[in-house]
Amino acid sequence: MQNDRSRWKTEGHSSEVHEDFLRNSVQRRNQLEKILFSYNNLHRLDPSYGEIVQRAFESNDPIALWNFENEVLLNSKDVDDLMQQQFAAPVQNNQCPNPYQNCGYQNNLVSTLDASFKVHPFAQHGNYMPPPAQFASNPNVFPQPVPPYTMDLAASNSGFAHPQIVNQPMHPHVPVGSQNYNPPQFVPAPPTMMPVGAVMVSQGSYSMSPPQIDTSKPPSGYGFSSPIFPSPSYSQYSGPPANEGFPDIIYDNNGVAYCRVVSAPVCVVSMSQSGSSVCSSQSFSSGQSDISMSSRPPINGSSVGNGSLSPMTDSVREESEDEDYGTLTPVGQQDCDLDSVDTESVANEPEPYSSTMSEMPPLDDVDDIMENLDLSKTLIEPETLEHSDNMSVVEIKSEPVSEMTTDSLIVDDDRDTSISEIIKYLDTSDDVLESWQEATGRKKCFVPQKTQKLVYPLPLSKVEKPLQKCQQTLAASTIDEDSKEASTIALPDARKKLTKKEKRLMAAQKANQLETDDDVLEAAYRERQKHVEQAGGDYSSSGQKDQKKKRGKRPVSNPPPSLISPQILHAVQMAIANRAKKISESGRPIFHENFSYQKFYETVDTFVKTWEENSNEMNKVLQFIEKRILAFKMVQRPQSLSRITIYEQLQLNLPPAILPELCFLAGLTSDSTDKLEYYEEIFFNLF
């Protein structure tokens, strides 16, 4: 018994010692937390606490710091009030279980005020059933649970009159409904769950509202509904038949349906050939489109006899010419006088179409008539224009020779015809038109329908009775029509028929004359020579010319680019302009926090008071700047480039506000170089 009592006393004593140890440990922990809180919030306490801590740190005596912590901080009522105010506010306002959540004291220490806090319980959520396994394929979709019905299912056999409708949110991966999408479809839940009739999606706009589906005899329990993602309907597309190996509808990871589209090559054709032309697969320009024979314009010029553009034979050509063109009627047989004939009106007057084959002359006879005319001079020279009284103008349309009538041969016997009326006509013959058709015949282009006129100066001897000659030609052609022999009319100036080579040469010469100014220059040269001869040879074109002075070689390449970028130059210019603007608006500064700048300001201010601005000051400053630029170029230092740039910009545009400072620096050249460099460096640093 004694042993048991002694052992019990020993065990009781050890338990008391253990309790005292734990109690002391907790108490010391609380004291240390209070001391740490005081150090962290020392700025919120009275300033006397900070002074005591400062003296304890400066003394380097750990006992002084120990006494401050155990006697001052632990017994301080201010620290207790601050801790109570700091940790009680979250409990009253935010109901925060963490005392260090909304305060600056965040040292991850164990709180000593756990007893004063009541942990706020979490929100009690409903005990819903977990979603079924079939909806777990897509983790982003969570079906909305539906509470069970409360009515007696056994007492009712007619079903429910009011099906439940649940608003389900639209998830980000679900496409927004539009006119191209089908309305949402819904499937019922498993048999153990209660199916929902219809679900209205609040965030989607569909073309039609979902149908209200009534359910009969639903089982008890919870029901879930999940929308099937609508698949887009491509009703406008009618593609190739579906292939079993490659389905038309494809679903991605989110369940969105995509339709497979098979693209086929398409040939783009013009609107004129779409659906009507045989060669619709060929694309061509509108300028090269085919023209039917009925819509083709009549071919003018000498292309009728060329054969490359017209496939008709000679007999067919003669018949067509006989049908299209009328009788050759002389101008003299009309009911008007020769002097009153209007050139423009007669040329544009339509020709009569009532004719017979016996009244039309052969082709060769009319060709000979045109060749017998004097066609040697095709250009109007200045000397010829002066004597325009002795010549007449023959206006001929650019029609085929076989189609030419006397209406196209208009003789103007007016002696008062001006030169401007003669020059306004173009000088283009059938030879030029024939050569143009030969060059472009392979491209199968048609001759532009443009009336061209020929101007030929004729002497008066040939203008006396041209109409009588035409009448004689017509009479001779009617006599020799049956024989169809090549008859030539005996004219006074009959000429040899030109060959094809000569015609080509003449056409090339006339085309060259139209394209270049050689004839105009040649006429001007002859006019000048004539003027020189009339002046008596005072001056000639072969006089001695002044010898030009030979100049030295000039570099062809561009000068080397500047070593300074434009951005740096712009920055320097803006710095100079800003400093000059500040001085002109606010005045010259006198005080500065830096002693060197302060001394520079005072010295410049003293210099400005005694300085008088003269016209020679600018020249002195410019000379000073040039000398300093040369000095910086000779000394290769890193800062030399920036100094040279500032001086060069000041040399180009020197503001008046900075002129006194440069005059002050220019006056220091007579003093020591160290003093100049000292103030000059301060001057540069002001920008």
UniProtKB/Swiss-Prot annotation:
Residues 277-295 have a biased composition (Low complexity). This is Uncharacterized protein C02F12.8. It comes from the Eukaryota. Residues 277-337, 342-361, 531-564 are annotated as: Disordered. Residues 300-313 have a biased composition (Polar residues).
